[in-house]
Amino acid sequence: MYLSTVEKIDPSKYFKVNLLGGSVSFDIDLSKSGCGCITALYAVGMPAAENSFSPFQYCDASKTGGYYCPEFDLMHANRHAYRTNAHRCDAPSATGLYSSCDTTGQCAVDILQNEGDYDYGPSYIYTINTQKPFSVNTVFYEKDGEFTGYTTTFV
């Protein structure tokens, strides 16, 4: 996975992080993200800049940019619903290219307003009141260096 520190794709501005056994935490304000709007935060397993790709290309599980690569959706949300999920790909070829990915995602977690256990929505009556900023933490589990699952919690 690479994180961008710029508004456009520039391979010199990406850096690789390993999330296995780690976590990602962030604060989010979804108060103005209503129905029909998706606020997204996701990570993709882009090839390293030193790979044989020329020019360096963006990729994701939907083949945006012309290439497939693994994707993890940390957040597809608005003030009424929240979704996380992982998109696996087949094994990469010798050149590091993937020929297909799961575009719908696996291990999906959907949190909807009035779902009970999660108590999420735009009102003070909800435990997670999306009219105000809240914190999200996603922990990535691994065994022997392989992704085995994740949990996402709100505070």
What do the PLM-derived regions correspond to, one by one?
Residues 1-155:
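GH16 jelly-roll
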